[in-house]
């Protein structure tokens, strides 16, 4: 397989925000299932840095994938204006909101190659169902068939990640300040991340199973590169039938369960101590409150007796006069 022109795509938060805004605006006007736009950025060796984007008018027939329209005149005018602002940002590819590849993506990508020979497609999921990266990057390659038929264009997956400069990080933190739940601890976050990771693994395994079933039934041609990579994955799996592996697994599990048990005991003892301390504090507070009430009653009684004695003295003085 030929070496890819790009090995990693870095998408900036500004691009994600622009795409979501584009999707929300178009969704209110019409019922388009996806929106399309152009990606701007720069190349650094084999890393593509996508720092900006703009929307492009796009429409397609829901029934016939071969019928679609992309306004390239609007594209050229918008790119001319963006180039005046920042000449270093060039057209590096295009995006759509998918959430999966479409049959006419190859044809659209061929059109985008007029402006960028190594055009990259980034699918941005604006309504993700699970936590994780909302981006999937692809680049078109020539696929050679084993049966001698002519080569055809297909998409090759490229690693993607979210990256930001310092100013963008400050802006994103400011936007997320009111969304973050400060009551959630690190433990719950770790457990949530592991659960979502297992869900993602399950989804990938189902995709692999579906692919292998289609290849076995003859619905898809054999791609030796994919088969070799799957074989490498299977070779890395541990042999669960080995007695040593089973013993090591049980020992590791028992150690972890002992730690969990001790943590539960310590938590119970601490809670019991807190309960006792709370009861003692409440008892002392009640005693103090009772003493204060008794003292206030005694003071009021003394004041009344003093008032009576003063009144009696005044009466005696009047009688003497």
Swiss-Prot record:
<keyword id="KW-0832">Ubl conjugation</keyword>
<dbReference type="GO" id="GO:0008237">
    <property type="term" value="F:metallopeptidase activity"/>
</dbReference>
<feature type="modified residue" description="N6-acetyllysine">
    <location>
        <position position="313"/>
    </location>
</feature>
<dbReference type="InterPro" id="IPR000555">
    <property type="entry name" value="JAMM/MPN+_dom"/>
</dbReference>
<feature type="domain" description="MPN">
    <location>
        <begin position="9"/>
        <end position="144"/>
    </location>
</feature>
<comment type="similarity">
    <text>Belongs to the peptidase M67A family.</text>
</comment>
<dbReference type="InterPro" id="IPR033858">
    <property type="entry name" value="MPN_RPN7_8"/>
</dbReference>
<dbReference type="InterPro" id="IPR024969">
    <property type="entry name" value="EIF3F/CSN6-like_C"/>
</dbReference>
<comment type="function">
    <text>Component of the 26S proteasome, a multiprotein complex involved in the ATP-dependent degradation of ubiquitinated proteins. This complex plays a key role in the maintenance of protein homeostasis by removing misfolded or damaged proteins, which could impair cellular functions, and by removing proteins whose functions are no longer required. Therefore, the proteasome participates in numerous cellular processes, including cell cycle progression, apoptosis, or DNA damage repair.</text>
</comment>
<feature type="modified residue" description="N6-acetyllysine">
    <location>
        <position position="314"/>
    </location>
</feature>
<keyword id="KW-0647">Proteasome</keyword>
<feature type="modified residue" description="N6-acetyllysine">
    <location>
        <position position="214"/>
    </location>
</feature>
<dbReference type="Pfam" id="PF13012">
    <property type="entry name" value="MitMem_reg"/>
</dbReference>
<feature type="modified residue" description="N6-acetyllysine">
    <location>
        <position position="204"/>
    </location>
</feature>
<dbReference type="InterPro" id="IPR037518">
    <property type="entry name" value="MPN"/>
</dbReference>
<dbReference type="GO" id="GO:0005838">
    <property type="term" value="C:proteasome regulatory particle"/>
</dbReference>
<feature type="cross-link" description="Glycyl lysine isopeptide (Lys-Gly) (interchain with G-Cter in ubiquitin)">
    <location>
        <position position="180"/>
    </location>
</feature>
<protein>
    <recommendedName>
        <fullName>26S proteasome non-ATPase regulatory subunit 7</fullName>
    </recommendedName>
</protein>
<dbReference type="GO" id="GO:0042803">
    <property type="term" value="F:protein homodimerization activity"/>
</dbReference>
<keyword id="KW-0007">Acetylation</keyword>
<feature type="region of interest" description="Disordered">
    <location>
        <begin position="281"/>
        <end position="321"/>
    </location>
</feature>
<comment type="subunit">
    <text>Component of the 19S proteasome regulatory particle complex. The 26S proteasome consists of a 20S core particle (CP) and two 19S regulatory subunits (RP). The regulatory particle is made of a lid composed of 9 subunits including PSMD7, a base containing 6 ATPases and few additional components. Within the complex, PSMD7 interacts with subunit PSMD4 through their respective MPN domain. Interacts with TRIM5.</text>
</comment>
<dbReference type="Pfam" id="PF01398">
    <property type="entry name" value="JAB"/>
</dbReference>
<keyword id="KW-1017">Isopeptide bond</keyword>
């Amino acid at each position: 397989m030929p070496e890819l022109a790009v090995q990693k795509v870095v998408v900036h938060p500004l691009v994600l925000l622009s795409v979501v805004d584009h999707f929300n605006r178009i969704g209110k006007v019409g019922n388009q299932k996806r929106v399309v736009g152009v990606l701007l950025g720069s190349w650094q060796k084999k890393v593509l840095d996508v720092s900006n984007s703009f929307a492009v008018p796009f429409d397609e027939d829901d029934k016939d994938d071969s019928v679609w329209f992309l306004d390239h005149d609007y594209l050229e005018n918008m790119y001319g204006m963006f180039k005046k602002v920042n000449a270093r940002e060039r057209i590096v590819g295009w995006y759509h909101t998918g959430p999966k590849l479409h049959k006419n993506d190859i044809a659209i990508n061929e059109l985008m190659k007029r402006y960028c020979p190594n055009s990259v497609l980034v699918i941005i999921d604006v309504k993700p169902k699970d936590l994780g990266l909302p981006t999937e990057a692809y680049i078109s390659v020539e696929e050679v068939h084993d049966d001698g038929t002519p080569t055809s264009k297909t998409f090759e997956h490229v690693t993607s990640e979210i990256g930001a400069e310092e100013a963008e990080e400050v802006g994103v933190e400011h936007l997320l300040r009111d969304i973050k739940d400060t009551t959630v601890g690190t433990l719950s976050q770790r457990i949530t991340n592991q659960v979502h990771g297992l869900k993602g693994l399950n989804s990938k395994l189902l995709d692999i199973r579906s692919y292998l079933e289609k290849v076995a039934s003859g619905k898809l041609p054999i791609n030796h590169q994919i088969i070799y990579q799957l074989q490498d994955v299977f070779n890395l799996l541990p042999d669960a039938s080995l007695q040593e592996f089973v013993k090591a697994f049980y020992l590791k599990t028992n150690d972890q369960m002992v730690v969990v048990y001790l943590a539960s005991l310590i938590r119970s003892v601490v809670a019991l101590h807190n309960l006792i301390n709370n009861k003692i504090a409440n008892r002392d507070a009640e005693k103090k409150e009772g003493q204060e009430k008794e003292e206030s009653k005694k003071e009021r009684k003394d004041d009344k007796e003093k008032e009576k004695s003063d009144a009696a003295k005044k009466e005696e003085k009047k009688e003497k006069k």
